[in-house]
Amino acid sequence: MKFTTKIKEYREKVGMKQFELAELVNVRREIIVCLENGKYNPSLKLTMDIAKVFDIQVEELFSFIDENVE
């Protein structure tokens, strides 16, 4: 299974820049870049902070892809 986030999707949906989201959740922009590219797994606190910004449930930020399905 591959773990992916929908952070970029939600961010772009509201017209927010990476640096703006980073400021709202108190991290560097590079962290947002890594999250969106699947190179960093967020802490529970960061996940909750991001979900709060978009007014969504934490579960809505993630999806799982089964890489073994043909």
Predicted segments with their positions:
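Alpha-helical residues within the helix-turn-helix
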Residues: 12, 23, 52
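A short, Lys/Arg-rich alpha-helix, primarily the initiator
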Residues: 1-13
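Short, basic-rich loop-to-helix N-cap that marks the start of a DNA-contacting helix
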Residues: 39-49, 67
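Short, charged recognition helix plus adjacent turn
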Residues: 52, 60-70
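Short alpha-helical DNA-recognition segment
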Residues: 16-33
